[in-house]
């Protein structure tokens, strides 16, 4: 038997370090060739690291949330044959491996499967039902168990694991549900008014850490100013309904988003200073002819901004189809690195949750972001009469270092004019 060291691979584009997001294995596991060992993140792209060989895990080289250098030791395996690490008294024992979690002493083999199945209930009978792990300690569980826990609304932090090294099994979830139900029944109506003293320490790692760093950097570096304008989209919504009725079956249903993209594309012809990126270190503003619109998209892991490239070159349905593809790729974690960078202006919409006013954060190094609020029906005065109209606010933010307030207001007024008179969206 020999020792095989797997190093953090170079995943391209000159990346010098990555963040370890999640282990898919633990010390003592046997792994096959090409089996996924871990997930790492660079910028906003998550990459799975497979094992190049089969073997048994001897040591893990880091904890989730840790930043690791490319070429650094990721994992050690015991393999058949000589391995790639020369055996010596010093090398026989890894110098400073980091286990996935603090290892418990291994227990003797269980005598019968029935005893293993009953272990979770025995543990829960002897311990407090809401006892949790130490802050920062990640519960061990398979992806299937984690997914089931999410579906059931269970925090794994509070589930006692009966597997090796405290690993949470499906039986532990069953036991937790059974015990949780009995507590709720015994508590009666007053249970909802009981004092709570539990707390949970959630490490800010992976995509959430990247979002935090990017938002902090943008707010620290960019002097934001926001501008809010209301828009009458009654005629636009009538046009959208007509197009969907006539062409929706053949070309797909249109949402409001491709109309907004089209309005921005047309308006930016007269305001190229807003379709730009500002290098504040070189003090250079680069204006772009191509309109690459970042589409702020919420995923299960956090905010992603896939890029609709060359929005000026597509019609409504072309942009709608590409936006749908990018949004699905972002939500499923399959977006490519190049699809998440290179935008020249960003469009942010919270849909029906859009509220009345928002103050979106600029996607640095861009100089503008257009925020879309929800559509509401309101009484408006038109031609001296009070009528019901569909109204929507645009809440936009700009970099005041390179964008003057008058230019920002004029740009939004141009977008407003296009949306309130939708036929002008298609005049060249």
From Swiss-Prot:
Basic and acidic residues composition bias: residue spans: 121-136
**Keyword annotations from UniProtKB, A to Z:** Acyltransferase, Glycolysis, Lipoyl, Transferase
Keyword hit for Acyltransferase: yes
Top-level class of the enzyme under EC nomenclature: transferase
Q: How is the cofactor bound?
A: Binds 1 lipoyl cofactor covalently.
Return the Low complexity bias intervals.
89-120
Q: Quote the catalytic activity from the record.
A: N(6)-[(R)-dihydrolipoyl]-L-lysyl-[protein] + 2-methylpropanoyl-CoA = N(6)-[(R)-S(8)-2-methylpropanoyldihydrolipoyl]-L-lysyl-[protein] + CoA
Q: Name one GO molecular function term.
A: acetyltransferase activity
User: What cofactor does this protein call for?
Assistant: (R)-lipoate
Q: What Enzyme Commission number does this protein have?
A: 2.3.1.168
Q: Which family does it belong to?
A: Belongs to the 2-oxoacid dehydrogenase family.
Q: How does it assemble?
A: Forms a 24-polypeptide structural core with octahedral symmetry.
Protein name as annotated: Lipoamide acyltransferase component of branched-chain alpha-keto acid dehydrogenase complex
Recorded source organism is: Pseudomonas aeruginosa (strain ATCC 15692 / DSM 22644 / CIP 104116 / JCM 14847 / LMG 12228 / 1C / PRS 101 / PAO1)
Q: Which gene encodes it?
A: bkdB
């Amino acid at each position: 038997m020999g020792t095989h060291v797997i190093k953090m691979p170079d995943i391209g584009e000159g990346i010098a370090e990555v963040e370890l997001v999640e282990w898919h294995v633990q010390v003592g596991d046997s792994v096959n060739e090409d089996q996924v060992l871990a997930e790492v993140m660079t910028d906003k792209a998550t990459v799975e690291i497979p094992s190049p060989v089969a073997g048994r895990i001897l040591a893990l080289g880091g904890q989730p949330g840790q930043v690791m250098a490319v070429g650094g030791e990721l994992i050690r395996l015991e393999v058949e044959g000589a391995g790639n690490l020369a055996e010596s008294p010093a090398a026989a024992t890894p110098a400073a491996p980091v286990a996935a979690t603090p290892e418990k002493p291994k227990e003797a083999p269980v005598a019968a499967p029935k005893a293993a199945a009953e272990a979770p209930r025995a543990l829960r009978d002897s311990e407090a039902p809401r006892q949790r792990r130490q802050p920062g300690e990640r519960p061990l569980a398979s992806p299937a168990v984690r997914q089931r826990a999410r579906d059931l609304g269970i925090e794994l932090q509070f589930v006692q694991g009966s597997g090796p090294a405290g690993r949470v099994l499906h039986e532990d979830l069953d036991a937790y549900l059974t015990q949780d139900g009995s507590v709720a029944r015994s508590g009666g109506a007053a249970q909802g008014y009981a004092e709570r003293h539990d707390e949970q320490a959630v490490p800010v790692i992976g995509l959430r850490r990247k979002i935090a760093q990017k938002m902090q950097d943008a707010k620290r570096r960019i002097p934001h100013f926001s501008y809010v304008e209301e828009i009458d989209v009654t005629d636009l919504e009538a046009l959208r309904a007509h197009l969907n009725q006539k062409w929706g079956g053949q070309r797909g249903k249109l949402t409001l988003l491709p109309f907004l993209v089209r309005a921005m594309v047309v308006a930016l012809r007269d305001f190229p200073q807003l379709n730009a990126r500002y290098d504040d270190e070189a003090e250079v503003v680069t204006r772009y002819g191509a309109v690459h619109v970042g589409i702020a998209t919420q995923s299960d892991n956090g905010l992603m901004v896939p890029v609709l490239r060359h929005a000026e070159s597509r019609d409504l349905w072309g942009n709608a189809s590409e936006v749908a593809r990018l949004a699905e790729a972002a939500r499923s974690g399959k977006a490519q690195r190049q699809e998440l960078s290179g935008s020249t202006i960003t469009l942010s919409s919270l849909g029906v949750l859009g509220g009345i006013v928002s103050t979106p954060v600029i996607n640095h190094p861009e100089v503008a972001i257009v925020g879309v609020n929800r559509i509401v029906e309101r009484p408006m005065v038109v031609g001296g009469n009070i009528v019901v109209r569909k109204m929507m606010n645009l809440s936009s933010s700009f970099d005041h270092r390179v964008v003057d307030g008058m230019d920002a207001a004029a740009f939004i007024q141009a977008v407003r004019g296009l949306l309130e008179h939708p036929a002008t969206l298609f005049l060249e």
